[in-house]
Curated annotation (Swiss-Prot):
CDD domains: FlhG-like. ATPase that plays an important role in maintaining flagellar number in Pseudomonas aeruginosa. Exhibits anti-activator activity against FleQ, the global transcriptional regulator of flagellar genes. GO terms for cellular component: cytoplasmic side of plasma membrane; cytosol. This is Antiactivator FleN. It holds the Pfam family ParA.
Amino acid sequence: MKQMGSMHPVQVIAVTGGKGGVGKTNVSVNLALALADLGRRVMLLDADLGLANVDVLLGLTPKRTLADVIEGRCELRDVLLLGPGGVRIVPAASGTQSMVHLSPMQHAGLIQAFSDISDNLDVLVVDTAAGIGDSVVSFVRAAQEVLLVVCDEPTSITDAYALIKLLNRDHGMTRFRVLANMAHSPQEGRNLFAKLTKVTDRFLDVALQYVGVIPYDESVRKAVQKQRAVYEAFPRSKASLAFKAVAQKVDSWPLPANPRGHLEFFVERLVQHPATGSAV
């Protein structure tokens, strides 16, 4: 990912799942660490506005959150937590109903806050909330890349399809990347992807790309108990090696060559009303 002056593109990846329990936050955290391990400057945005998870998963205690930035009480750099591997973390603005309910002044302040740090950043990983509510749609719609996490539960495929359908029909999104998580074999991961593509190919005009599989690994549970990322706590585990492989794929994804790739434009899209596309 090349530097391009003061307005270099930032790869924005929204990690989502359509339901809870698919391991989405674990994927976000460990993907961020694996990308940092490749030499990328990574920021992780905890976008679960109702239930902050990233800081809990890593045993971090935020003194301030994005809500303080939105309200003008501090700068974005004041809320950043330093995670493992040099990953910077923006704690969730818990209690904030939606990013679309901002005043024009808050809107402008948020765009400025992110533009101030974009020179020192290559990748922004966004850990979204579960479900298909306005908050999730806002973050996913604003990102350049959508990484959809699925697992071997019947509701996982159903909910992933519901999210794809909503984003496709209401917001014109046509490209999604899919990661199978907690799979008991590589074939199980491929089968999950096949199930999802079977329904999307039949009913929607979208393109799904299979990113890979993270195997079921007891090391992940042990790391969670330690409040550490598995990539850091057990670097030679099956899950960590899989995250490394996924990060190498992600690192090869093309950067947007137009202004859409600049961080300010991500925030601009984020604070647009999801139903109308107009800023509020």
